[in-house]
UniProtKB/Swiss-Prot annotation:
Pathway: Carbohydrate biosynthesis; gluconeogenesis. Its EC number is 3.1.3.11. Binds 3 Mg(2+) ions per subunit. InterPro entries: FBPase_C_dom, FBPase_class-1, FBPase_N, FBPtase, Fructose_bisphosphatase_AS. This is Fructose-1,6-bisphosphatase. Substrate binds at residues 118-121, 210, 242, 262, 272. Homotetramer. NCBIfam families: PRK09293.1-1. It catalyses: beta-D-fructose 1,6-bisphosphate + H2O = beta-D-fructose 6-phosphate + phosphate. HAMAP family: FBPase_class1. It comes from Dictyostelium discoideum (Social amoeba).
Amino acid sequence: MSSNNLITLHRWLLSDTHKNMENKLEMANLFSGIALACKITNNAIKRAGFESNFGLAGITNVHSEDVKKLDVIANDAFKMALKSTREVFCMVSEEEDSIIPVSQSQAGKYVVAFDPLDGSSNLDCNVSVGSIFSIWPKASKDHNYSNDDVLRKGRDMTAAGYALYGSATMLVLTFGQGVYGFTLDNHIGEFVLTHVEMRIRTKGSIYSINEGNSVFWDKATQEYVKAIKSGADGRAPYSSRYIGSMVSDIHRTLLYGGIFMYPGDTKSPNGKLRYLYEVAPLSFIMEQAAGKSTNGSSPCLDMIPKSIHERVPVFMGSPACIDELLAFQKKFNHNHSTTSQHEKDN
């Protein structure tokens, strides 16, 4: 974008681009907090080698995962920056086991769920990582938060986004009116609009999945991956690209097309990814970019979680790829169900 037409995130949020966006000033304030948290996190990552912030913090989180030092820094940055906006009612973090309260004097009317540092297991080898967030209006009529405020259908989100800390630092977001990308200009310290109305290709030729788990997949997933790898029906074989950092894998899928998959399997029936702050916000972005996201039977955005850290299977990407995946799910899982019922009857 020309330096004569720099549109910063704050300027964009207040522009006429969002004539239909409710509470524009509140959203601008809230996103100023998110942008600040992302800048703090980005700076901590870039300086981690100098400040001995790589490696483990010596604790585990609610998921029994080893917590990295940078996980702690990013989590603290998001909590501090979000509370300071006075727009947040309560929060959910991937790093904490329960709802995070906000004092009544600071509380606003939005619920924010976030993964402060997705893919942090890759940090020590300098792989790109990210932050993910989702925003809902609060459900409570008073100042007392409850599970009803956070256990929400994805389709009821007000906004969602992710930050990618890679060769460049990007903030990608949606308010339900398309997807926009902002790149951090380190010279001026601002996120600047660089990607307007991002849209995924109708069909792609890249698949992204951890094939180390293939022995645990159901028949439908095994056969689908086998088909796209082999170039069945005379088509060109898909290329495999899997980083193991969800933000990085989704960002590539969004730009180049294709499909990202983290299915449930016999080892982890509900998959690995958490709904509120991973699957739901990235599904919202994918749908707003003309893509699709499913748990294998229904759209991810139509789900309502039963717990704040609930895990769900997910397949998302180019619509033609998802439609083909669902055809395999219908064919093979239906056949499996029919066979199982026949064996049971006999």
